[in-house]
Amino acid sequence: PTVERTSNFLPIRSRHAKEVLKNLKEDSGTGPDLPAAKVLKHCFSSLAIPVAMLARLILKNGIWPAMWKVHWILPLYKKKAVFDAANYRGVHLTPQLSKVVERLLGRFLLPFFEATDAYGPNQFAYAKGKGCKDALATNVLQWIWWLHNGYQIALYCSDVSGAFDRVKATKLVEKLQKKGVTGDILNVIQSWLGEREAKVVVNGTFSKTAKLNNMVFQGTVWGPPLWNCFFEDARAPVRKSGFDETVFADDLNCFKSFDKDVPNPKIMTSLEKCQSNLQS
């Protein structure tokens, strides 16, 4: 199935916009567009129609507004020396209206991803009805079963450093097309993935502008599901190596059972092959 049949007319209604606006979290950080989430929420009735019209126009033209491609980045201290910028994590604040429209259009896109298993069968993050507890239970129960039956277990765990910031936009668009995303909604996503600007903000003082590109941008609504679509085919080399997998966002767990008489060097060779296939 594809979304092409609905891509030229997605029923974006004012009642849908009203629902999204009403459900905004009042304590959500104010972004570069300046309207606070609390204001948008309290004015949901008056804003619903213009927001719905704006979403329709964006879909028709296939262009994400340039003013929504601006990020404020707040440095959040992690640990160690406070004067070392490497010890801070950047928290992205993006326009609240941008996220409202992402949720509006996401009403059609995200159910399509779920219905077509676009994230893969064993992705437990950002997926409806799944979570980290499910991933943990799946792993532990499988391993206990193998151990109970006298098997050895080979386990390889990996994650992608700075995952959201390492996504080739053109490659992601190709993958979405293969998954059946076409037409107007694909044009909007392609525009959404375009280059952005960011400024670091400290005590009301702004840094020089930096460019953001080839990312599924942090601080957005679409970032997590688009990452899942991008990372879905990472399981192919795992399966090729004879391993099973569970995935939680960018955390990939690969495991395989071996008879108790299989020597450790042979198991290590199998693990190294799995790692090599993943990195190739």
PLM ranges: what are they?
Residues 1-87, 99-100, 152:
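Surface-exposed loop/turn segments and immediately adjacent short secondary-structure elements
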Residues 105-123, 148, 224-261:
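Active-site palm subdomain of RNA-directed nucleic acid polymerases
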Residues 27-35, 73, 83-93, 133-177:
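Conserved catalytic palm subdomain of right-hand nucleotidyl-transferase polymerases, strongest
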Residues 31, 70-73, 89, 123, ...:
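Catalytic palm active-site di-aspartate
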Residues 14-22, 50-57, 107-109, 135-146, ...:
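Inter-domain linker/hinge segments that demarcate the starts of reverse transcriptase
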Residues 162-179, 253-280:
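Catalytic palm subdomain of template-directed nucleic-acid polymerases
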Residues 17, 31, 51, 73, ...:
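Mobile genetic element proteins and their domesticated derivatives, centered on retroelements
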Residues 38, 56, 90, 103, ...:
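Catalytic-core region of right-hand nucleic acid polymerases
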